[in-house]
Amino acid sequence: MHRYDVVVVGGGHAGCEAAAAAARLGASTLLITHKISTIGEMSCNPAIGGVAKGIVVREVDALDGIMGRAIDQASIHSVILNSSRGAAVWGPRAQADRKLYKKAIQEIILNHDNLTVKEESVDDFLIESNSNGEPYIKAIITSSGKQILTSKVVLTTGTFLQGMVHIGEQTTPSGRMGDKSAVELANTLKKYDFKLGRLRTGTPPRLDRSTINWSILEEQVGNNPPMPFSYLTEKINQPQVSCFITYTNENTHRIIQANLHRSASSYLNDIVAPRYCPSIEAKVKKFAEKNSHQIFLEPEGLDNITVYPNGISNSLPIEVQREMINSIKGLENAEILRPGYAVEYDYIDPRELFHTLETKKVKGLYFAGQINGTTGYEEAAGQGIIAGINAALSASQKKESFVLHRTDSYIGVMIDDLVTKGVTEPYRLFTSRAEYRLAIRSDNADRRLTQKGYNISLVSYKRYSALQNKLKSIKQLEEKLESLKITPEQLRFCGIKISHDGIRKTALDLLSYPNIDWNKLQEIWPELTNVTRWNDNKADQTVIQVVDTRIQKKNADSSVTRWNDKTGYWNDSKTTSNTIKNEICEAVAIEAKYKPYLVRQEADMKFLREEMNTQIPTNFNYSQIKGLSSEVIEKLQAIKPATIGIAKQIQGITPAAIVSILVYLRNRKTKVAANSA
């Protein structure tokens, strides 16, 4: 009987990241899915990224994950959301060619070292108990009754766990239209006393592109050039297309209101739907005063006739969906290729998980993705990569786990929210959830996380080397700017007013001022010429180039440093290019802008890391701490927080209780040290 170090159940976004991560760490990994042809399927919208979500994709990529590389191979329309605001809230987003995205994912998964893929359904686990009476995974059991030995299982069932699809009054057992749901597996989780809940989501009808009147619609042009997600992608090669915008109207709303009683939402009221991605029925009911709602018409591929109307997810009867669609401007003759529907499914209470995403009830069992109550491809991928990493590390008998914190990533924010607060509705990431969002931006995910991944052999040397070159380039550009200095009085003659404190400012210092950019630096120091800002109006994207005029002189000194586009850092060769890469300039400018705030924030983050990372022993008996109420003890015993930081975020745990635990742990540590002396 063959044995695998790690078995991943489910081939969606969480499952693919989990399997690839485990395999990268050298674990013999099995990805088991009910249908190989649907690996990497984009079940809902044909897009990756968005506000906060796009940062997660870059974080996954910084850890050598696969989502960023796949979307770069499939990107057909790219935008930066919130581009007119600060860099901390920029949200890269790309429309995908569905077929190209799935192809890219499958090429990686099906050809990955240490990774086997099998087409099968999993119904049960073989669970035994160790000498301490703790249950642990020994094998999975497939629907055919076959046992596959493993000590680590990552469960990524998406919406398939006892999934039910609803179109009007019609209900079909399915996790996605056309795919069967996982019923036996849901029963297995109940058998092992996992707390299950019910959530729902939905998707809009798909339209035939040839039946839409595009000429009367509002065009939305993407960024030019499109921005890659992966730090290893040099440029997007796919042709770029436009999206279009239309709106519902009063007639549309009358049709919906007249048929609300026929919508699945009318009998699924007790099952919570996504707050931030509501159905059109929910919008019409909740915002009755509004006469229209925006709809984005998104192409599903370059050679695909299907259009995704983002904004009108619904579960109305098919004939009502047709009437509703045809009441909308530009869609008067549009034909529906596939109706919209709602899907309800089981999820587990994520408070039953550690920050590694291992369950507290069964050792070696990990959950990732929508099974934890989240919504979105990106949230699933972020959980998948963490679960896969920790499953592989544990399988290799390594004591350390891999946990990202709120201070260093959006993935850390999400997982911390899930395991400490739980969910009452489908969880979606936003920048507002991150206390330290100034430090965890889309531009610096590699600088935050790639070294961490490389330290555990997760990240390839190619990516690590690229990061080192980038860091060297940033440092040398900063040093160059720090060598240029000016007094407040001299700045006044340049038309720039700052405090007359007599202190000389460097060019790097000046970049932190809100009214000073690369253009101003060029005016102050003529040797920095051709500092250009390009704005395509549609995307409000800034491209900065810096050229040093000194090296353009025929008799330039050979010692002048020049930018090398091939190696990615400064060198002294006369033959190399002198154009500073936009990525490096942008990194320096953003860091300079945020530096005054980051310095203050770093002090808070340092304290949080030191105090909040204080470990709490497994199965710690809180009743031995005097002063804790029975309610506090009950909550702590149930959730079993691994650190003080986790305990602090549990609802109902008072600051006084946290102090009592900290004091007890410190006294205990002191006694142990004294006894061993």
From Swiss-Prot:
Compartment(s) of residence: Cytoplasm
Key word NAD present: yes
Molecular-function GO term, any one: flavin adenine dinucleotide binding
InterPro entries in the record: FAD/NAD-bd_sf (IPR036188), GIDA_C_N (IPR049312), MnmG (IPR004416), MnmG-rel (IPR002218), MnmG-rel_CS (IPR020595), MnmG_C (IPR026904), MnmG_C_subdom (IPR047001), MnmG_C_subdom_sf (IPR044920)
GO BP term, pick one: tRNA wobble uridine modification
Principal location listed in the UniProt entry: cytoplasm
Cofactor list: FAD
Chain residues that bind NAD(+): 273-287
GO cellular component: cytosol
Keyword list, A-Z: Cytoplasm, FAD, Flavoprotein, NAD, tRNA processing
Quaternary data: Homodimer. Heterotetramer of two MnmE and two MnmG subunits.
Family: Belongs to the MnmG family.
Protein role: NAD-binding protein involved in the addition of a carboxymethylaminomethyl (cmnm) group at the wobble position (U34) of certain tRNAs, forming tRNA-cmnm(5)s(2)U34.
Protein name as catalogued: tRNA uridine 5-carboxymethylaminomethyl modification enzyme MnmG
Lineage of source species: Bacteria, Pseudomonadati, Pseudomonadota, Alphaproteobacteria, Rickettsiales
